[in-house]
Amino acid sequence: MTHRSSRLEVGPVARGDVATIEHAELPPGWVLTTSGRISGVTEPGELSVHYPFPIADLVALDDALTYSSRACQVRFAIYLGDLGRDTAARAREILGKVPTPDNAVLLAVSPNQCAIEVVYGSQVRGRGAESAAPLGVAAASSAFEQGELVDGLISAIRVLSAGIAPG
């Protein structure tokens, strides 16, 4: 696989601390398992899954990934989380786990590290990915600077898609 990476540092988008909780502080119906995971039940009629983003944002993100993948005949994927010390190497490693890594584009974003990486497989090279990658990073960082994480992800995917020719 041949990969290309583009990186642009932006201001922090999100941050947080790891929290610990005592058993007595847990709400009723919640337990601390032996593995350290917190597990709980929900009240009847209440959602049992709490997504990190509003459902409308998740739908918009899914639509951007779906339509971009169809338009370019390339699998688009997003990774959101820590990328470690070598962000480009970690992004390439994550791309390798995508079902079709040779024909995929990964947008990897580490908000706490202020890092954005775009890597792609060998079948995408030569189809415009080289020039689309820095434009996608710029589109993402512009929205991230405004505190708009999901909009930045969607903008980057759309820009990448517009710059990559179908295979």
From Swiss-Prot:
Q: Name one GO cellular component term.
A: plasma membrane
Q: What is this protein called?
A: Uncharacterized protein Rv2468c
Entry-linked InterPro entries: DUF5130 (IPR033437)
Which Pfam family, just one, is annotated for this protein?
DUF5130
